[in-house]
Design a protein with these regions (language model features):
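Residue-level marker of positions within ordered structural domains that often coincide
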Residues: 30, 112, 155
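N-terminal strand-loop-strand
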Residues: 2-53
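Generic detector of short, locally flexible boundary/turn motifs and exposed helical patches
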Residues: 2-7, 17-20, 44-48, 69-75, ...
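Compositionally biased, intrinsically disordered low-complexity regions
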Residues: 26-30, 40, 89, 115-116, ...
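Short, charged, intrinsically disordered terminal tails
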Residues: 143-145, 149, 154-161
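Unchanged
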Residues: 58-148
Length: 161
């Protein structure tokens, strides 16, 4: 009797990894002594609405700060001036046959002009934009890591850090 040993299982095929660098920010406007930030709504792959901070990929020879200013303007309609760095968020996701390692650099921006609008978003990712009081933003932002960035902005503005 001939016995055949079971074939060893093939290890799972690893997806190729792609590195992405983005920048965005917390753009602040003070109205009636209340600090507000502009947040955008997007639909995720499952079709659910997610409220998040404006951000996007670095283009050509842009600096991270230039990317943050451009992305905030494109996705919210608000022109801003960078006041400082708020930190970095890193996360992984998979899509289109790759694993993506994304690093997002966030900046605190002061609103200097413009009007809330999603009309300038070239990718048409934003479906809505709103001013939210900074002290209430934790209940509006979908992602905990972005709530942490908003908290850093709050502390920075309050002079705590």
């Amino acid at each position: 009797m001939t016995s055949t040993a079971p074939r060893p299982a093939q290890p799972p095929r690893r997806l190729p990894t792609v590195e992405e660098v983005s920048a965005g920010g917390v753009v602040i406007d003070v109205h009636d002594r209340v600090a507000q930030i502009a947040v955008i709504a997007r639909r995720n792959r499952a079709g659910r609405v997610e409220w998040c901070l404006p951000k996007g990929h670095v283009e050509n020879d842009e600096t991270l700060e230039q990317t943050a200013v451009r992305e905030v303007a494109e996705e919210t309609g608000i022109i801003g001036r960078v006041l400082g760095s708020l930190g970095t968020i890193e996360y992984w996701f998979s899509g289109s046959g790759t694993r993506v390692h994304k690093v997002v650099h966030h900046y605190l921006l002061e609103a200097t002009g413009g009007e809330l609008s999603i009309e300038g978003d070239p990718d048409a990712e934003a479906i809505d934009v709103a001013w939210i009081p900074l002290m209430d933003v934790h209940s509006h932002l979908t992602f905990p890591n972005e709530r942490r960035i908003a908290q850093v902005a709050w502390e920075r503005l309050a002079g705590a850090t």
